[in-house]
Design a protein with these regions (language model features):
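Periplasmic/ER-lumenal interhelical loops and adjacent helix-loop junctions
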Residues: 50, 54-59, 90-98, 243-358, ...
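Contiguous transmembrane helix-bundle modules in multi-pass membrane proteins
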Residues: 214, 328-334, 347-470
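Transmembrane alpha-helical segments
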Residues: 133-141, 180-192, 220-228, 310-311, ...
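Membrane-interface coil-to-helix junctions
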Residues: 23-133, 156-168, 172-177, 271, ...
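Start-transfer (signal-anchor) and selected internal transmembrane alpha helices
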Residues: 1-35
Length: 518
């Protein structure tokens, strides 16, 4: 019996992982092609080149030799583990990455001591984070009782969302949030429905240990999710409210204790960081009517399917527990997005940044998946009353917008196909119907990703040749600095040099400078 159970679960895991790898390859296909053929680096020309890759190289060089956490080369000298805790220094996934790189360096496959190695690692790690995101999200929707078809569609909508690319491209360490959120919710649900608390403890401990800012974001959304599940019970819950209260709080305390090193390091780094807002910068209350902030077309930070609108307006489906939950979350995020103060709150009450869009990506994806799952409970008239106005507005936007977004057309096609399925009860041809829906959803996401790439990724891309330019990593300057370092070996010796572009030149050229950029 146990052997049969293990075999079935292990088999399912490998199948899900295999599908996740395929979806990830599709998701990153254009970026893989651009990197191999054109040498286009999957990292932002700003923070990616100036911070992400130099920080990774610096951390690897110090962690591989188990050097002291205080190092003279970190600015004017400092605790690099604490100083880079906002980025990668406390990420267990990055530690595993460093271990693999060390093995490769030992056997002579890799040369991570030069900045030219790290663009390849940047792309590979982004894909690994995406694979983990797909796998964890599938298991989350499974425990939320999504049917297999709805699970697949919702997982594709989230895993192939623009946020996955945008986060991994711009601030790659933020890619960890994309799987930590569903993992934390999965942990809660496993306890509520199966009385198993282990995954929740691990997920919260990982979050607290990895990044204090992650803990801040996650505390808001997981806290709200937990309160909702505590107040409103679900039919498959097997623990009482009292048990939910006592056990989850106890598990959270255990998570805090097990992550105390990372949490203390992150909190102390946060407290020592001057986050005081520039008094000359005024944060407007209302969000500007700008394409950057659009949700359903041409969005810079995120673009989601117009199916979300129809799902939100289908109030009859709010009788389903998780449909109502994800609809409420989506409504709150939409309403909150109208104010820049909402963006500021998710960035430590400093300059407004849309760091919360990954939550919207998950809630809207779950909502769309559940809408398709419960579609057959609606009648045709009810569906059309909500769909036709959305389609008309979408068509008008396509015609009047200078970008003529193709993603809206694909979204309209999806709504029409759903109408045909509802009208003719095509769920009896389940395999064909599901295959068509999955194909259309994938096409929609690919089109959305392509549009977002042209808008939010391409303008900030650089090629491998940038790594050899005079203002980033010049061979002449490199040789000159090597000579200086040979004659000045003391830790108090400093080189006062920083290029206009490579602001973290001391990390890139391996010398003790007088500053660092973060």
């Amino acid at each position: 019996m146990l052997k049969k159970w293990l075999n079935s679960n292990v088999k399912q895991f490998f199948v899900i992982t295999f599908i996740s790898v395929i979806l990830t390859l599709i998701l990153f296909s254009t970026h893989i092609y651009d990197y191999i053929v054109n040498g286009t680096v999957f990292s932002g020309a700003g923070d990616g080149f100036r911070q992400m890759m130099p920080f990774q190289m610096y951390l690897y060089e110090h962690l591989r030799s188990f050097s002291s956490l205080y190092d003279a080369s970190f600015g004017l000298g400092g605790d690099y583990m604490k100083g880079l805790s906002y980025y990668y220094s406390l990420s267990p996934l990055m530690w595993l990455n460093f271990l693999f790189i060390k093995i490769g360096e030992t056997v002579g496959i890799f040369n991570p001591t030069t900045i030219h190695f790290w663009p390849t690692n940047q792309l590979i790690m982004a894909m690994i984070r995406a694979i983990i995101t797909f796998v964890v999200t599938f298991y989350l929707f499974k425990i939320l009782h999504f049917k297999r078809s709805a699970n697949m569609i919702a997982t594709i909508l989230y895993g192939m969302s623009t946020v996955v690319i945008y986060f991994n491209f711009t601030w790659s360490f933020y890619g960890n949030l994309l799987y930590l959120l569903p993992l934390s919710i999965l942990g809660l649900e496993r306890y509520f429905q199966q009385r198993k608390i282990g995954i929740f403890i691990v997920a919260i401990a990982l979050t607290l240990f990895s990044n204090f800012y992650f803990s801040y974001y996650q505390a808001i959304i997981i806290g709200c999710y937990y309160l909702y599940r505590l107040i409103f019970t679900y039919k498959y819950d097997i623990v009482s409210r009292t048990q939910k209260l006592i056990c989850v709080i106890s598990a959270t305390v255990l998570s805090v204790l097990s992550s105390v090193f990372g949490l203390f390091t992150g909190i102390s780094a946060f407290l020592e960081n001057d986050r005081k807002q520039n008094p000359n910068v005024d944060i407007p209350f209302l969000t500007p009517l700008d394409y950057h902030y659009f949700f359903f077309s041409d969005g810079f930070y995120i673009t989601i399917s117009i199916l979300t609108i129809v799902a939100l307006l289908s109030f009859k489906l709010y009788r389903f527990y998780f449909y109502r939950l994800f609809a409420i979350v989506t409504w709150i995020l939409f309403i909150g997005s109208l104010s820049q103060y909402f963006d500021s709150a998710f960035n430590g009450f400093s300059f407004p940044e849309r760091r919360w869009v990954y939550i919207l990506a998950l809630s809207s994806s779950a909502l769309c998946g559940l809408f398709i799952q419960h579609l057959s409970t609606l009648n045709m008239k009810y569906y059309l009353i909500r769909t036709i106005p959305v389609c008309i507005i979408a068509i008008l936007y396509v015609l009047l917008s200078p970008t003529h977004p193709l993603a809206l057309i694909v979204g309209i096609i999806l709504l029409i196909v759903l109408a045909v399925i509802l009208k003719f009860s095509l769920w009896r041809y389940k395999k064909l119907t599901v295959a068509i829906l999955v194909l259309i959803v994938m096409i929609q996401q690919i089109v959305i990703l392509d549009n977002n790439k042209n808008m939010a990724i391409k303008p900030y891309q650089q090629s491998l040749s940038t790594l050899k330019q005079h203002d980033y990593h010049s061979n002449y300057v490199n040789q000159l600095i090597k000579k200086i370092n040979q004659n000045a070996t003391g830790s108090f010796n400093r080189i006062d040099y920083m290029s206009d572009y490579a602001l973290n030149s001391p990390f890139i050229y391996h010398y003790n400078g007088i500053s660092l950029y973060s």
